[in-house]
Amino acid sequence: MHDRLSRRAARLIGRAAPLLSPGRQAVLSLSATLLSAAALAQPAARAYAIPAGSLESVLTRYALESQLMLSYSAADVAGRRSGGLTGSHDAASALRQILAGTGMRASLQPNGGYLLRVAAGADDAQTLPSVTVTGDGAETAWGPVAGFVAKRSATATKTDTPLHETPQSVSVVPRAQVVAQAADSLDQALAYTAGVMPLDGGALRNISTGFTVRGFNITGSAPLYLNGTKLPMNSMSGAMEPYNYERIEVLKGPASILYGQAAPGGIINLVSKRPTAEPLREMEVKYGTWNTRQLAMDFGGPLTEDGNVGYRLTGLARDADTMVRHINNDRQSLSGSLEWQLSGATRLTLLGGWSRTDNPYDVGKPREGTLLPNPNGAISRKVFLGEPGFDRFVVQGGHLGYLLEHKINDDWQVRQNLLGYNHRANSNNLYMMTSSVDAANPARVERLAVSRDDTDKGIALDNQLLGKLRHGRFEHTLLFGVDASRSSLTRDQAVGLNAVPIDVYDPVYGSTPTLDPARRSISRARQVGFYAQDQIKFDGRWIGLFGGRYDRARTEEAPDDGRQDSHAFSPRAGLMYLFDNGLAPYYSFTKSFQPTSGMDFGGTPFKPTTGTQHEIGLKYEPPGVDAAITLALYDITQRNVVTSDLANPGFSVQTGEVRSRGAELEGRASLNHNLDVVAAFTLTNARTTKSTRGDEGARPASVPRSMASLWLDYKLAALPGLSTAAGVRYVGRQESDGVTVPSYTVLDAALRYRLQNWEFALNVKNLTNKRYIAACPYACYYGDERNVMLTARVNW
């Protein structure tokens, strides 16, 4: 047997210990020790900042951070307090400080873990009720991750499921990686993730979030999810701050089985920070390139003596410029949660957030002078082609919701999740008329003025019944759900065609465009879905994942009086096998649907596009090593794609088809407790396979054929508290309307030092100050120049 089985046994013992007699608990504890076949390497010295608190909470947090196995009696630790742990320690030194004054001692065990017991009663330790705590065992699908390697997720199943037992590819970016890489936007947080590419190369991170996943633009009807619930339908409703989230997860491939309408490439799910059992106090200050100044805070802990009510409050304020003149990156955000354990069986968590962004919009650069030659030379990375006195983008809004959980008995529970949101966005922008310069004057571009006032609001409700059944050698985790959502986008838009052209090499500002009267449009969407899922385990080795969902959706467009009613059934099937050596091959089949607005020449509303994916893969978790590797091969076909109606110019037909086939390899590891590794490699062959435009074989924009990345984060044992890191990101060539965006390679680096409860960091992105085009979906966007960020963080 290997370490995975010992961890399972440990978790079962931890849950069952209070229900068993002391003698049976002792036997179970001894059995768990015997199940560990691979001795765990002792952690090297590393820095900790664990505040004082109950001994149980300090031990739990230490196990989470060190990934060390600790076994102790629940009765022994009850009522005892610890002074916490600060400074740099190896395992023995850390436990001496944690246990100082508690009357307990730690003994090294043959399996590499430690047995904790009362010093005076050591001879009777074999009769004590035993609880085993490990870093792996402490993780849940909605909680923090110890280090860089997540072991559980709910994004693919809506249940707390090990990633190693999920027959579909899921990438999890934990909080530790976001901090180590100083990622202040979603595109930066996902830069080392296989198969994910920002639409604009990250150039618009100050106002919006858009990505392609597995070759498909996922920004349309379902841009982002928060705790499994869809966020606003408008992709311009503002950027998201990684600081507010515990983990960022990407489910690859169709996700309609659980989430309804969505693009076939996948979804991005943000998991909120939740209340903590012990007091949490963190302040963070950043200063860097482009006059970046940022202050952030993170507070949490219990509000009552019995710990039944807890809170979490996270806030951020940033005042910053960007690489492009006249464009800033200012933002304020506040997120909070309140958790109330109403009874032993019922828990209510309130979640809310507010944010405000006030930043102009980078309209990009023309192709001539960036991607293509221009007789006047290369266009500066810093030039702004809008009007400083006219261009603006202000978005303000928030969300509020709750998560309600009630346990009916040990096997069944009901859950209800609700999320409501309201965003208001006001923008004025001068866009380029085309993606090219004026043919008569290659230094000039024609411009178009657009003013928008958007109100984006909605509400979503998800009701779930979750249960477990066991019969013979079969174990079932059953999920039944009904969800419904309503959303609306009201837009007042005015356009001005007489904007003054601008010289891209010597811009002269000051003109004010004249706008036509604003026109109002209203988009409304409703959806209700019924879904069922069965996660089956047979003999502890075979994993089956089967389910289906039926959706009814309605979209309405005014003033065009357009209305579309659609329905779809979305099945999923998956199968995998768990080998003792940590290998787990799998196969999955999934489908998606996505409503399409508009009508054909005959007035018939368009059908939803549909996506079908076949995926085979191999997951590997080496026994005794904190690592996870996933290899996935996929084939996705999207049908009912809108293409030109050649018989009726100005209209469209749904005879188009897009196919994406590719391979993804992603690995994460924490080795010897001082080296963290994140590696990814992507091959994507996305093509238009059916079209009336004659563009069969064309690749979609912002979809590189290949991508690769590697991040190494090393804690220096010789210099306790000091860490260094380096990263490399390669993005292969992209195609866009017949032109090619060259490949590029960017280097990143970091240096960190922890001194007791303080941490100081220096992060450098684009270390060599490489000049490159990041993306060219319409206009062209340069990648960021070299930028440096200094961070000071304190926990107390």
Q: Where does each model-flagged region fall?
A:
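Face-selective signature of the C-terminal outer-membrane beta-barrel domain
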Residues: 400-422, 447-558
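Outer-membrane beta-barrel translocator/receptor signature
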Residues: 243-246, 257-336, 342-347, 398, ...
